[in-house]
Amino acid sequence: CSSDSGKRLRPGIVLLISKAISPKFILTSKHKRLAEITEMIHTASLVHDDVVDEASTRRGVDTVHSRFNTRVAVLAGDFLFAQASWHLANLDNVNVVKLLSRVIMDLAEGEIKQNLNRFDSAQSFSKYINKSYCKTASLIANSSKAAGVLSGLNDENLTSLYDFGKNIGLAFQVVDDILDFTGNDKQLGKPAVSDLASGYLTAPVLYALEENKKLSVLINRELAEKDDLDDALRSEEHTSELQ
């Protein structure tokens, strides 16, 4: 899949789960719609995130606010959230509505938490995991569970689907954060090391802080001096966990 087309990971997981738990592996129209809703919510959150992060590219192409303007980007994200909510209501399943509504709340909460903890070298790993759950894992966990709800699974199986989605989501986020240091712009679909430059301290940085106290000095002054970002990257390269 090319960088500009996106991964389609989230709807793909929903469709695979839905097919696996459906009689004769046949997808229903509601399961297909759930996958579409999942991608709408994800895309809407990316449009808004790019505005907040002032990102110029996403998946190798201009972001919405770069191509048009901030006002259009905010309204486009709002429209996608609204359309997702409309299709969600038309599934006529209040439990699915609750699950996906929780996701939208988590996405906003995660973005707030991320920005409140910018350049905070004292940030705990548990805060990072909680933020990662809100921004990434919640959507995969709750949409996986929603697929089970539409199939009429019992509570035990629904919990298993939720846990599966949660673990996949957290693992995906950690790998994505590692790639921010080991990948290139083309692979990532966005500028490399953009998270660190923006003050978002991810798993590799938190581990590096345990080994290199000088890194906390650079981060606490918000990488303000000329060579601070390069020095921070050198610290990352010598982190045993990243290697």
Question: What are these regions, as identified by a protein language model?
Answer:
Residues 1-240:
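All-alpha prenyltransferase/terpene-synthase fold signal
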